[in-house]
Amino acid sequence: MSKAKTLLMSCFLLLSVTACAPKDQAADMDYDQTKKMVVDILKTDDGKKAIKELLNDDAMNEALVIDQDAIKGTIEKTLTSKKGEEFWKNIFEDTDFAEGFAKTLQTEHEKVIKKLMKDPDYQKMLMSVMQDPGMDKKYSQLAKSQEFRSYLEEVINETLSSPLYKKQFEDELKKAAKDTAKESE
């Protein structure tokens, strides 16, 4: 009988405790409240510290690292596809973009050339070509040849089609048009 009383009393206490407990508030929270709470937590110093620790964790960094082969494949597909070729053709028609791109490449090319000029092997090779006694004769023959003239014409055409030159030429034309408009007024 005492076991039955103890069991009955335990059940009664358990029911009364659970009946008096507050409702589960997590079920009542809507999305906006949860979002605000999470944002507030992340803005605290503890939240920022937790994120920094998470980003410094090696296992997490390994999970975040993207497969380099996948990146390479995506870039190759994007750049070499017909859509990619069309995209690059269209974007390089924009003189402002082409100018910026050319300026970026120009600085890199200048760095490479300056590095080469400091390279002793490159200097020796360049000097041996320049000091060759027959080079003067070859230069004058070359300048008179039809091949050189064709090459020179090609270089001039390339220069005229260069994004940097186009931009400079465009700017000069605009400036000249403004000056002409001012003079005629």
UniProtKB/Swiss-Prot annotation:
GO terms for cellular component: plasma membrane; spore wall. Residues 1-19 form the signal peptide. A lipid is attached at C20 (S-diacylglycerol cysteine). InterPro entries: GerD_central. A lipid is attached at C20 (N-palmitoyl cysteine). The keyword Disulfide bond does not apply. It is a lipid-anchor. May be involved in fructose recognition during germination. This is Spore germination protein GerD. It comes from Bacillus subtilis (strain 168).
